Amino acid sequence: MTTTLTRPADGEGSVQVQQDASVRIQEGALVIAVYGKGGIGKSTTSSNLSAAFSKLGKRVLQIGCDPKHDSTFTLTHRMVPTVIDILEEVDFHSEELRPDDFMFEGFNGVKCVESGGPPAGTGCGGYVTGQTVKLLKEHHLLEDTDVVIFDVLGDVVCGGFAAPLQHANYCLIVTANDFDSIFAMNRIVAAINAKAKNYKVRLGGVIANRSAELDQIEKFNQQTGLKTMAHFKNVDAIRRSRLKKCTIFEMDSSDEGVMECQNEYLSLAQKMLDNVEPLEAEPLKDREIFDLLGFD
C-alpha cells in the first residue's frame, strides 16, 4: 500500500510518496533508474541499454514509467497495454491476472512492462509505479531477473515520479550538450541526493545523447562531481531505428554509426555490471548554472 509521508530528511517540508517497504526488488539484481529532460531520448537509451545487457547474457526487465507508455516499443515492436489499463479491466483484482497479461517479451528476451499512469490531472504516477512493482512481485516475476531498468517520465522529480529511486541501485541521467538539458540534470541530481539519504540509490553517471561535443556537459561535471559514462553523437541510425520500431542492435551493422553505437551501449552495460563507483555529486544553485553556462 502506498502512503504519503512527510520526510524531513528529503528536504525541509518535503512530502514524498513512500512505497510499502516489503515490496522490494530482489537483492542481487542490478536496478537502474534512467532520468533526464523530457524528449532527450530516455526511452531510446533505456531500450538500447536493455538490449545491450541482454547481449551480455543477462536477464533483463524494462519498466516504462510514463503515461505515454512508449518506453518499450522498440523492444516489442508495438505499443503494449499498460499495467493500469489491465488492472482496470479486472477492477484491480490482481489475482485474476496472468503474467502474460501485462508482461511482454521483446528483443533478445528482454521482458517489457509499461506501468502507464492515471488520467491527466488526477492521481499519482508514483503510486502506479509502486503498484507495478507489487504486481511483479506477487507473480514472482522479479526472482529470475539480473537487471531492471526503470525508464522514468521527463525531468519530473516530485515524490511520485521519484518513486523508482526507492528501488534503484543507480541513477543514470541522459542529457544533451545544451543549457536546458543540463539545467534539468542539475534538478535531478538534487532529487537523487535527497533520496540517497533514506535509500540505497546512488548516482551512476551521465549519458551524453545527440551531442557532437561534450564541452558544456564536462564543464558542468567538473563543477558538480559528475562523470560522463557514455557518449552518443547525433547518429541518424538511432533516429531510423525508432522509425522502424526496433533497437540499434537490429539495424544493419554496416550502416554508418551503427557499430559504434552498439559498442558504446555494450561498453556502458559492462561498466554498470562491473559495479561502477557511485558518484558524490553536489548540484549547483540556479544562478550558478547561468553563470557557468548561460553567458558565454
Swiss-Prot record:
Name of the protein this chain belongs to: Light-independent protochlorophyllide reductase iron-sulfur ATP-binding protein
GO process annotations (BP): light-independent chlorophyll biosynthetic process; photosynthesis, dark reaction
Pathway(s) where this gene product acts: Porphyrin-containing compound metabolism; chlorophyll biosynthesis (light-independent)
Binding site for Mg(2+): S43
Species in which this protein is naturally found: Prochlorococcus marinus (strain MIT 9313)
EC primary class: oxidoreductase
Residue sites binding [4Fe-4S] cluster per the record: C124, C158
Alphabetized Gene3D superfamilies for the sequence: P-loop containing nucleotide triphosphate hydrolases
EC number(s) from the headed UniProt entry: 1.3.7.7
Function: Component of the dark-operative protochlorophyllide reductase (DPOR) that uses Mg-ATP and reduced ferredoxin to reduce ring D of protochlorophyllide (Pchlide) to form chlorophyllide a (Chlide). This reaction is light-independent. The L component serves as a unique electron donor to the NB-component of the complex, and binds Mg-ATP.
Cofactor: [4Fe-4S] cluster
Cofactor-binding details, from the entry: Binds 1 [4Fe-4S] cluster per dimer.
UniProt keyword annotations, A-Z: 4Fe-4S, ATP-binding, Chlorophyll biosynthesis, Iron, Iron-sulfur, Magnesium, Metal-binding, Nucleotide-binding, Oxidoreductase, Photosynthesis
Subunit description: Homodimer. Protochlorophyllide reductase is composed of three subunits; ChlL, ChlN and ChlB.
Lineage: Bacteria, Bacillati, Cyanobacteriota, Cyanophyceae, Synechococcales
Catalytic activity: chlorophyllide a + oxidized 2[4Fe-4S]-[ferredoxin] + 2 ADP + 2 phosphate = protochlorophyllide a + reduced 2[4Fe-4S]-[ferredoxin] + 2 ATP + 2 H2O
Domain of life: Bacteria
List of residues binding ATP: G39, I40, G41, K42, S43, T44, K68, N209, R210
GO MF assignments: 4 iron, 4 sulfur cluster binding; ATP binding; metal ion binding; oxidoreductase activity, acting on iron-sulfur proteins as donors; oxidoreductase activity, acting on the CH-CH group of donors, iron-sulfur protein as acceptor
SUPFAM superfamilies for the chain: P-loop containing nucleoside triphosphate hydrolases (SSF52540)
